[in-house]
C-alpha cells in the first residue's frame, strides 16, 4: 500500500479541486491517500503558513490559484522542497483562452459564480427528495423534469443523480389500480420522460427487492404476466401523451441521466429557435 499526502490549495472553497482529485485517484489502486484541504488561500501570509505544513507532510500539491504572485510563490517553494505541483485548471483555461481569443479573468473563486449554481443544486436536491414517488403533486409544475414509469423502473436513483446535476426532478409511479391525479397530464413546464424496461429485468429487480426485505418473492408483484401487463399499460400512457421514452434495461443510471439531459437540451434548443 502506497501512502500519499495530497495537498489541495484553492483561493475558493476547494470543491473543484476535490472533484478533480477524486476522479484522478479513482484510476489507481493500492494507494492510501491523506488529503489536506487548504481553501480560501488569498494572501502570501496564509500561503506561508500552509507551506510550513506541506514541508512537514510532503506529497503532491494540486492548486487552483489565479493570483500570479501567490501561485508563483507556491510553485517556487514546491520546487525548492522537491515537490510536484500542478495547476488543475491551467490546461482548460489555456485552451479556452486560445479558442476565444481572450485573457482569463484572474478573479479568485470565479468558478463559484458557481456559487449560484451550487445553491441551485442544493435546492434541486431538496426539491427532488421532497417529490419522490408521487409526493406533493401540487408542486410538480415547478419541476424541470418529471420521470414516470412502473415500480422499480429506476425512477428514484435517476432522479437523485439528475438533482446532483442541478435539475429539479419529481417522479411519479404508474400503478394500474391507482392512477396519478389529473393534473399530472396537464403539466406544462417540466419535461416528462417515461422509463421502461424488459419484463424479465423488472421481475429480477423486484424479486431481489422482496428478498432484501425478507418478504416472499412469490407474489403478483413479480408475476411475469402481471409485470408485462404493467409495462404495456405504462407504454400506452407514454404513447397517448407523446412523452419521450427511455428503455433502462441495459443502461446504467448515469447513461439514463445523460439521455434525459440530452432530451432537456434538445427541448430548450427547439424553444429558443421559435
UniProtKB/Swiss-Prot annotation:
HAMAP family registered for this protein in UniProt: PDRP (MF_00921)
EC number: 2.7.11.32, 2.7.4.27
Listed Pfam families: Kinase-PPPase
Function: Bifunctional serine/threonine kinase and phosphorylase involved in the regulation of the pyruvate, phosphate dikinase (PPDK) by catalyzing its phosphorylation/dephosphorylation.
GO molecular function, one term: phosphotransferase activity, phosphate group as acceptor
The protein's name: Putative pyruvate, phosphate dikinase regulatory protein
Species this protein is from: Rhizorhabdus wittichii (strain DSM 6014 / CCUG 31198 / JCM 15750 / NBRC 105917 / EY 4224 / RW1) (Sphingomonas wittichii)
Enzyme class: transferase
Binding of ADP, residues: 149-156
Coiled coil segments of this chain: none
InterPro entries named among the record's database cross-references: Kinase-pyrophosphorylase, PPDK_reg
PANTHER family, sorted: PYRUVATE, PHOSPHATE DIKINASE REGULATORY PROTEIN 1, CHLOROPLASTIC
Record lineage: Bacteria, Pseudomonadati, Pseudomonadota, Alphaproteobacteria, Sphingomonadales
Reaction(s) catalysed (UniProt annotation): N(tele)-phospho-L-histidyl/L-threonyl-[pyruvate, phosphate dikinase] + ADP = N(tele)-phospho-L-histidyl/O-phospho-L-threonyl-[pyruvate, phosphate dikinase] + AMP + H(+); N(tele)-phospho-L-histidyl/O-phospho-L-threonyl-[pyruvate, phosphate dikinase] + phosphate + H(+) = N(tele)-phospho-L-histidyl/L-threonyl-[pyruvate, phosphate dikinase] + diphosphate
Family: Belongs to the pyruvate, phosphate/water dikinase regulatory protein family. PDRP subfamily.
Keyword vocabulary terms for this entry: Kinase, Nucleotide-binding, Serine/threonine-protein kinase, Transferase
Signal peptide location: none
Amino acid at each position: 500500500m502506497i501512502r500519499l499526502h495530497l495537498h489541495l490549495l484553492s483561493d475558493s472553497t476547494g470543491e473543484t479541486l476535490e472533484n478533480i482529485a477524486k476522479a484522478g485517484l479513482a484510476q489507481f489502486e493500492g494507494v492510501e491517500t491523506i488529503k489536506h484541504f487548504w481553501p480560501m488561500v488569498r494572501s502570501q501570509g496564509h500561503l506561508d503558513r500552509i507551506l510550513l505544513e506541506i514541508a512537514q507532510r510532503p506529497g503532491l500539491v494540486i492548486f487552483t490559484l489565479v493570483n500570479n504572485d501567490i501561485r508563483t510563490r507556491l510553485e517556487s517553494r514546491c520546487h525548492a522542497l522537491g515537490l510536484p505541483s500542478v495547476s488543475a485548471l491551467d490546461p482548460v483555461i489555456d485552451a479556452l483562452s486560445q479558442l476565444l481569443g481572450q485573457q482569463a479573468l484572474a478573479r479568485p473563486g470565479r468558478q463559484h459564480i458557481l456559487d449560484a449554481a451550487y445553491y441551485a443544486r442544493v435546492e434541486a436536491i431538496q426539491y427532488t427528495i421532497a417529490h419522490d414517488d408521487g409526493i406533493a403533486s401540487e408542486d410538480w409544475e415547478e419541476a424541470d423534469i418529471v420521470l414516470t414509469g412502473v415500480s422499480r423502473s429506476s425512477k428514484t436513483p435517476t432522479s437523485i443523480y439528475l438533482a446532483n446535476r442541478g435539475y429539479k426532478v419529481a417522479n411519479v409511479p404508474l400503478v394500474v389500480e391507482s392512477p396519478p391525479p389529473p393534473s399530472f397530464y396537464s403539466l406544462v413546464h417540466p419535461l416528462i420522460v417515461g422509463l421502461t424496461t424488459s419484463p424479465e429485468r423488472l421481475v429480477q429487480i423486484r424479486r431481489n427487492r422482496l428478498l432484501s426485505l425478507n418478504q416472499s418473492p412469490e407474489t403478483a408483484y413479480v408475476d411475469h404476466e402481471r409485470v408485462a401487463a404493467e409495462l404495456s399499460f405504462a407504454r400506452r400512457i407514454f404513447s397517448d401523451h407523446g412523452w419521450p421514452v427511455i428503455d433502462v434495461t441495459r443502461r446504467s443510471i448515469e447513461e439514463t441521466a445523460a439521455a434525459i439531459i440530452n432530451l432537456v437540451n434538445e427541448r430548450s434548443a427547439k424553444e429558443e429557435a421559435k
